[in-house]
């Protein structure tokens, strides 16, 4: 189930399924339960494509202890796909 909660200008998106979520413009991920991401991509400040798993040398595993996961300043998350778990992107 996917739900959208509006909080501020851009709002937030709860992701708790394994569908590809694209067209995002987010800077951080709140982890609501232990999660595995198969895809986490975006752009840097110049608009160049970035794979955050590669950039951050990260296997895609998030636990509630990772709250929140932020991308470097000026970068944006634009696509996320989960293998399991639940997150809120903002």
Model-derived features with residue positions:
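Extracellular/lumenal ectodomain signal focusing on beta-strand-rich modules
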Residues: 27-28, 39, 79
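Beta-sandwich interaction modules
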Residues: 12-17, 53-78, 84-90
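Short, surface-exposed beta-strand/strand-loop-strand elements in extracellular ectodomains
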Residues: 35-48, 52, 86-90
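Solvent-exposed, flexible loop/coil segments flanking beta-strands in beta-rich domains
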Residues: 1-34
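N-terminal functional modules and adjacent low-complexity/disordered segments of proteins
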Residues: 1, 47-51, 72
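Generic detector of intrinsically disordered, low-complexity, polar/charged segments
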Residues: 5-8, 20, 39-44, 57, ...
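Exposed regions on extracellular, virion, or secretory-pathway luminal proteins
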Residues: 20-22, 45-50, 61-63
């Amino acid at each position: 189930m996917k739900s959208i909660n509006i909080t501020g200008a851009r709002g937030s998106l709860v992701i708790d399924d394994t569908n590809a979520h694209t067209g995002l413009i987010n800077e951080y991920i709140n982890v609501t339960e232990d999660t595995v991401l198969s895809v986490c991509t975006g752009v840097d400040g110049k608009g160049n494509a970035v794979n955050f798993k590669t950039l951050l040398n990260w296997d895609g595993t998030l636990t509630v202890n990772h709250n929140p996961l932020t991308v470097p300043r000026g970068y944006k998350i634009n696509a996320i796909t989960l293998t399991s778990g639940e997150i809120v992107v903002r």
